[in-house]
């Protein structure tokens, strides 16, 4: 200590001139300590709020509840404040969730009137000048009134303007088809159709007199009104089959005219809105109504006009983690205006893609939908506030629901559910992941001669291709037509002939333009037509400066640690810290990270032991061999992924690298050989739809979500503290913090490998599927050891759950190699190889 017990420095620290060395040393230490935290402090205060932020996430704003999940259902600017509500998973009668009010200075107020539930509704009622969100009505001064759950039970999923008395009443819709009209002055609800959570509690004799909607599907999401109807969406299906199979019939879009319900379409739908957005349409009799949905083939976009009703279009999916017949994996996709009054700018979220959506979109004026960029966050709602975008997210669920797999081991979810807001610039939706995406119009389905597919989005991608599979009895002509301007005028683009039982791959050139494309066939077929589009890959292999401080994979030393979000309202992140040093691992102790991003050592052996037992990295859940990474999923399907730096094999086998963990609700972040992947839940087809996000050369030990942030360990011991690197008070532990979507800046996906490397193969037996989708600059080298020429079928699977299709058939002479550079427009999900004779063969792919 510099000071003695009495507080005096004494004379022993002075030289003969009376100079106090220890005092100077103390000043020097304080100076350099302040330097090491200067960058972090600047980042904490640059918004003018004084609160620490990391990648647009303010830890102190995190939302917690006592439920199995804590998602953000709505974020709305009102009364000079930002208002947010959270939800638990199935709580139609209330919960521990709260109504939050956030000031421009980012101070958070938790409203004592909060009654919780599973709300995601929000509407501003212009005539009464009130915001309705959840069971709350908020006036222009911020006063809150509450509609009790005993009067209006259900999981409030949406509001709509009243069809007959819009100035005095609004509609409430629940996720289980409960419908109410509410007086905006008295807040008295009148039951229209009973929520099935209430109905199911009644005796059978009581149910007979209760009005129920009895719509197709379950798990309601969106509601909107106009053109004389109220439109409502269900995005799921009930039953055990829906929990396991993603491609069964599920969900519905329905409309109600004030008397009767009508089924519009039997698919999974989510958002229902219009150009009026949160206010309702300005011209309800004529303004369009929009609806978004999906099936196992592609995204579905519906638009209603008053004269002819509904028209439907299709768009590709960037991510399949939103799939699942039960509908649980979507949260609330939205279309919202994030522009200004002078310049509207509608942003659509759907299946992992930010989309630019035209504010005047109709069936006759359908031009302008464009992909902006892909994202990883799970977003429940968003708005523009103070020239920033604010995304309300669903980050850390204590219960991982159906998202279990052996590759995670026996790991648990966080001890307490929590989520946060994500603040970004208005341009952020254009700056994240590549827009590579795919979708089918027909998938192994019977098609009549002359039948047209639904229009599929054709504009917005630099690389476009189509895969066709024809299971007919005779050759068929597939004719493609385009709507060049989105006004329903179709012109022929090209016709291709496909032999019976065969497939065809075609690329489109830059001169083949149009807003929408459709296809027809001139003879009966069981057909698959998949459009696979490539985005421009402008990233390099170098990570951004945000990742400075992470240890390199070949480094002998690193600061590691297992991570666990604590429960029991502690609201901290536990870190069971370790040192890696020249192949040896030593425990450092137990630390906790708090909302101010202080990492402090704690004397808590019980929690440390709990973490080591329940969050250990599993062993032997993937196999790294000479050719690739072998994955055997929970359904015993085999998949292969590219290799990275050779050191990853040793570290993986030593269980020093986390392989799989949920860091955004109901999907996993998979990590193998230096590549992060988005991995859908098994009920959304799992590894078949895996998507590479970024590749790197870092030694990442563990990763987890906490207060909306992505937290990682595996830090260079010499790294200094900054915006992203948090060091402990004793300097012996450290973590990296950021947003999950920072991962796009790690480096573009790359790797080498293949399903065969000097592998003994049997004639006619396909190789394991090997991932080829979402990479660029791809090349192939094939060889064999046979004494006679070998013919290889190179097959691709563009869908993930569709048929294998022939890409090329090549013959390789003895002692020679076949080399191929895939065209830039080539896009498929998986590739495999088949030899026509027994031999030892190599199929080696390089993704640079």
Predicted region positions:
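Beta-propeller domains
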Residues: 83-116, 134-148, 181-183, 193-194, ...
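Beta-strand-rich domains and repeat architectures in extracellular enzymes and scaffolds
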Residues: 60-97, 116-123, 455, 556-579
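Noncatalytic modules at the cell exterior or secretory-pathway interfaces
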Residues: 510-527, 824-839
């Amino acid at each position: 200590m510099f000071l003695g017990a009495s507080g005096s420095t004494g004379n022993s620290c002075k030289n003969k001139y009376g100079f106090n060395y220890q005092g100077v040393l103390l000043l020097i230490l304080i100076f350099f300590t302040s330097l090491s935290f200067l960058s972090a402090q600047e980042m904490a205060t640059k918004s003018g709020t004084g609160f620490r932020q990391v990648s647009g996430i303010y830890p102190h704003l995190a939302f917690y509840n006592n439920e199995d999940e804590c998602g953000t259902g709505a974020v709305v600017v009102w009364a000079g404040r930002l208002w947010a509500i959270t939800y638990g998973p199935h709580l139609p009668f209330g919960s521990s969730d709260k109504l939050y009010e956030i000031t421009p200075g980012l101070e958070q107020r938790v409203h004592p009137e909060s009654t919780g539930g599973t709300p995601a509704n929000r509407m501003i009622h212009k005539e009464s000048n009130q915001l309705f969100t959840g069971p709350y009505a908020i006036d222009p001064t911020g006063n809150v009134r509450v509609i009790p759950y005993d009067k209006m039970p259900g999981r409030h999923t949406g509001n709509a303007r009243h069809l007959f008395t819009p100035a005095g009443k609004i509609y409430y819709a629940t996720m289980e088809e409960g419908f109410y009209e509410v007086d905006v002055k008295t807040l008295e609800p009148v039951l229209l159709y009973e929520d099935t959570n209430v109905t199911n509690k009644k005796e059978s004799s009581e149910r007979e007199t209760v009005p129920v909607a009895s719509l197709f599907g379950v798990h309601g999401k969106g509601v909107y009104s106009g053109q004389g109807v109220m439109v409502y969406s269900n995005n799921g299906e009930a039953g055990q089959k829906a929990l396991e199979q993603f491609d069964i019939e599920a969900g519905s879009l329905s409309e109600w005219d004030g008397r009767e319900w009508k089924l519009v379409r039997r698919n999974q739908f989510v958002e229902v809105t219009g150009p009026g957005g949160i206010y309702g349409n300005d011209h309800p009799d004529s303004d369009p109504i929009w609806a978004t949905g999906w099936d196992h083939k592609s995204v579905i976009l519906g638009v209603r006009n008053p004269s002819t009703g509904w028209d439907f279009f299709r768009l590709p999916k960037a991510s399949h983690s939103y799939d699942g017949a039960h509908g649980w994996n979507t949260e609330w996709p939205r279309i919202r205006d994030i522009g200004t009054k002078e310049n509207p700018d509608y942003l659509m979220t759907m299946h992992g893609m930010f989309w630019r959506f035209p504010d005047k979109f109709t069936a006759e004026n359908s031009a302008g939908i464009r992909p902006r960029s892909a994202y990883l966050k799970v977003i429940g709602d968003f708005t523009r506030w103070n020239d920033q975008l604010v995304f309300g997210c669903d980050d850390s669920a204590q219960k991982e629901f159906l998202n279990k797999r052996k590759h995670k081991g026996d790991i648990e979810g966080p001890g307490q559910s929590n989520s946060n807001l994500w603040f970004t610039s208005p341009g952020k939706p254009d700056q994240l992941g590549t827009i590579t995406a795919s979708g089918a119009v027909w998938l192994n389905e019977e098609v009549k001669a002359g039948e047209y597919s639904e229009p599929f989005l054709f504009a917005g991608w630099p690389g476009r291709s189509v895969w066709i599979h024809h299971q007919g009895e005779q050759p068929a002509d597939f004719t493609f037509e385009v709507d060049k301007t989105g006004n329903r005028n179709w012109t022929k683009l090209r016709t291709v002939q496909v032999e019976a039982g065969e497939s065809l791959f075609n690329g489109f050139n830059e001169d083949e333009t149009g807003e929408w494309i459709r296809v027809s066939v001139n003879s009966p077929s069981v057909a698959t037509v998949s459009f696979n589009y490539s985005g421009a890959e402008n990233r390099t292999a170098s990570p951004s400066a945000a990742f400075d401080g992470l240890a390199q994979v070949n480094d002998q030393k690193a600061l590691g640690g297992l991570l666990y979000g604590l429960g029991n309202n502690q609201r901290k992140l536990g870190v069971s810290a370790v040192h890696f040093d020249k192949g040896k691992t030593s425990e450092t102790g137990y630390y906790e990270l708090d909302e101010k991003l202080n990492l402090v050592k704690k004397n808590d052996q019980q929690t440390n032991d709990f973490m080591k037992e329940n969050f250990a990295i599993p062993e032997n859940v993937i196999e790294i061999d000479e050719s690739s990474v072998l994955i055997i999923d929970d359904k015993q399907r085999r998949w292969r992924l590219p290799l990275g730096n050779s050191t990853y094999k040793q570290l993986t086998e030593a269980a020093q690298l986390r392989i799989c963990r949920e860091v955004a609700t109901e999907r996993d972040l998979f990590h193998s050989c230096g590549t992060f992947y988005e991995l859908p839940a098994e009920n959304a087809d799992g590894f078949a739809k895996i998507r590479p996000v970024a590749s790197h050369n870092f030694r990442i030990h563990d990763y987890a979500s906490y207060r909306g942030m992505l937290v990682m360990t595996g830090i260079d011991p010499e790294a200094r503290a900054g915006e992203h690197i948090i060091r402990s008070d004793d300097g012996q532990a450290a973590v990296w913090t950021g947003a999950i979507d920072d991962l796009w800046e790690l480096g573009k996906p790359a790797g080498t490998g293949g399903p065969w490397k000097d592998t003994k193969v049997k004639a006619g037996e396909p190789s394991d599927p090997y991932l080829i989708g979402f990479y660029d600059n791809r090349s192939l080298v094939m060889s064999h050891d046979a004494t006679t020429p070998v013919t290889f079928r190179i097959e691709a699977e563009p869908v993930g759950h569709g048929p294998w299709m022939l890409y090329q058939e090549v013959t390789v002479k003895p002692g020679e190699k076949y080399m191929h550079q895939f065209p830039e427009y080539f896009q498929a999900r998986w590739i495999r190889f088949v030899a026509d004779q027994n031999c030892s063969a190599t199929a080696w792919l390089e993704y640079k």
